[in-house]
């Protein structure tokens, strides 16, 4: 899959790609999520994605399914028109949706979805807008659930030299998202 949100010249050019085009890409960038070991196959895994942050959840879900897990997805979007590749997500696990306008799934935000009250998850993975991930991390902390966060940010050079993707960690030092 190649899911793109048009935000600048680079992504506009990427949107013009056609099947069979040859492209030169520097991947992967960033760090990967942790895939649990086979001994943990009964772990209840929740993948929470919001906006453009749903794209990495699709790939992670495919990897988890291939490793023998049954992930649960909780996807947030502004409206039903912003929910992408729903059929693909459903291939890899159960899918719950929230939309801000209520046009698909529950109305509201992922952190208010009823599934969080009904099921006790062992591990949460999340990617999306920073306020959403902060809320997810707070929920996970309050429930003593392990949570891995994948930051989304603008990336220009992909190697950290331009410092456009810098984020401050709670410990005080900076890290590059790329």
What do these predicted ranges mean?
Residues 1-21:
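Ferredoxin-reductase
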Residues 13, 56, 134-136:
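Phosphate- and divalent-cation-binding pockets in alpha/beta enzyme and binding domains
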Residues 23-26:
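Generic structural signal for buried aliphatic residues
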Residues 30-39:
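Short, Lys/Arg- and Gly-enriched loop/turn segments at beta-strand edges
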Residues 44-48:
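Conserved beta-strand elements of the Class I
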Residues 56-65:
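Histidine-anchored nucleotide/phosphate-binding helix
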Residues 73:
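Nucleotide and nucleotide-moiety/phosphate-recognizing core
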Residues 78-178:
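Reductase modules of NAD(P)H-dependent flavoproteins
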């Amino acid at each position: 899959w190649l899911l793109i949100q048009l935000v600048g010249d680079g992504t506009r050019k990427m949107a013009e790609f056609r099947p069979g085009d040859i492209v030169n890409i520097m991947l992967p960038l960033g760090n990967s999520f942790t895939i649990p070991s086979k001994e943990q196959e009964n772990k209840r895994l929740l993948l929470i994605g919001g906006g453009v942050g749903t794209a990495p959840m699709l790939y992670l879900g495919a990897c988890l399914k291939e490793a023998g897990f049954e992930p649960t997805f909780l996807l947030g979007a502004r409206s039903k028109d912003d929910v992408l590749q729903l059929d693909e997500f459903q291939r890899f696990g159960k899918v719950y949706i929230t939309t801000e306008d209520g046009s698909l799934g529950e109305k509201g935000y992922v952190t208010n979805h009823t599934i969080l009250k009904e099921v006790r998850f062992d591990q949460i993975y999340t990617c999306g807008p920073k306020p959403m991930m902060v809320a997810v991390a707070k929920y996970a902390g309050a429930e003593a659930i392990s949570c891995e966060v994948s930051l989304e940010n603008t990336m220009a050079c992909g190697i950290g030299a331009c410092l456009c993707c810098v984020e401050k960690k709670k410990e005080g030092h900076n890290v590059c998202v790329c």
